[in-house]
Amino acid sequence: MASAADNSTKNGPHSGTIPPLASGDRLTRPEFERRYSAARNVRAELIEGVVYVQASVRHKQHGNPHFLLVTWLGTYIGVTPGVDGGDNSSIRLDADNEPQPDILLRIDSACGGASSIDEDGYLTGPPELVVEIAASTASYDLHDKLNAYRRNGVQEYLVWRVLDDAFDWFVL
């Protein structure tokens, strides 16, 4: 027969509680997705098995540069059949990586593109172009993310280092 102490362990205040995401957590992609789906008003990504919870976005260092690149790439999409894009869309790359790049362009899988859209609406596989606006995130955008994108077949990776007033365009 179970004691009261046994029941409090099974039905206590923390039973069924999903832990929050925190920067630096080391998680599998399924566990990351479980926690991310339970989070409210949190933007995070999983890079090489490490969680990065993203800070609020500043206008001059991120919001406006982001808007300019979305406008440019949106114009390209408008005149290029078979190409679509995403803004802060999660990408299921592999077991340790689910980045949420600022912008992506992809060739539709029916037109020969490498990515597809899962039944639950997530992008799976590498888009053809990934774009990041890097102010505070340049250290991992230019290292761990670059390596993950290269290893998973992203063809091109553009990083706008806003504070340095420089672009890095990698053909991977």
Residue spans for each PLM region:
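Gly/Pro/Ser/Thr-rich low-complexity, intrinsically disordered segments predominantly at protein N-termini
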Residues: 1-172
